Amino acid sequence: MAKVCQVTGKKPMVGNNVSHAKNKTKRRFLPNLQNRRFWVESENRWISLRLTNAGLRVIDKNGIDAVLSDLRTRGEI
């Protein structure tokens, strides 16, 4: 399963671990993904989404129906 937020599209980033001696080794910064179920009143069913905490805040701000319609236009669901 890809580590991508379904709402915001956030993906892992690549960076460096930097030691005290300034030695650099590659690492990945992973998004804070959560699996959440949302009850959709208009469809009378549960929707499961894999999203970041930023995606949860977008749903809190805009509502689940607006986010789902946006996902459907993008072809995510």
Swiss-Prot record:
Keyword terms: Ribonucleoprotein, Ribosomal protein
BP GO terms, sorted: translation
CC per GO annotation: cytosolic large ribosomal subunit
Pfam name, any one: Ribosomal_L28
InterPro entries xrefs: Ribosomal_bL28 (IPR026569), Ribosomal_bL28/bL31-like_sf (IPR034704), Ribosomal_bL28_bact-type (IPR001383), Ribosomal_bL28_sf (IPR037147)
UniProt key word Cell inner membrane: no
Single GO MF descriptor: structural constituent of ribosome
Keyword Plastid: no
Family statement drawn from the similarity comment of this UniProt entry: Belongs to the bacterial ribosomal protein bL28 family.
Record HAMAP family: Ribosomal_bL28
NCBIfam families recorded: L28
Name of this protein: Large ribosomal subunit protein bL28
Origin species: Polynucleobacter necessarius subsp. necessarius (strain STIR1)
Gene designation: rpmB
